[in-house]
Amino acid sequence: MAERLNVLFLCTGNSARSILAEALLNRLGEGRFRAWSAGSMPRGEVNPHAFPLTRALGFSDEEFRSKPWDEFAVAGAPRLDFVITVCDNAAGEVCPIWPGQPISAHWGIPDPAAATGTEAEIAVAFREAARQLRNRIDLLLALPMAKLDRMSLQRGVRDIGETADGASE
């Protein structure tokens, strides 16, 4: 595997979960990873409730945009090592053929953008999604990448998505 690993997080709308995952891995990966996000049917704008969480990680709002996954399946796109879906709809869709045959996995997270209620209740839903994503990203970061063959790494990344909320036991 390359020294710096490239990860694409996918979601249908690319407005909340995948954006949060991109921000978290770019911050927590400390240069070992480069993350992006995209959607099969991007909403065209990031959900405003995601911004307080990305700002808390030290990012500006302008660093994120809702974009189609096709941008990553064309010549000149970054070579992807991992493609991870974070919503059930994207997991069931036919994805583009990614150059380089990246390792794929599904880490289902409830959609905070579907939360209703007061601003405080919606903020709680976004924080909970970010917590679950962070738990899974922490597990990804703990994998001994250099010591695992491709099949073991595939299994390890997929197993992360099968933990109840990403918490290690």
Stretches found by the model and what they are:
Residues 2-169:
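Short polar/charged helix/loop
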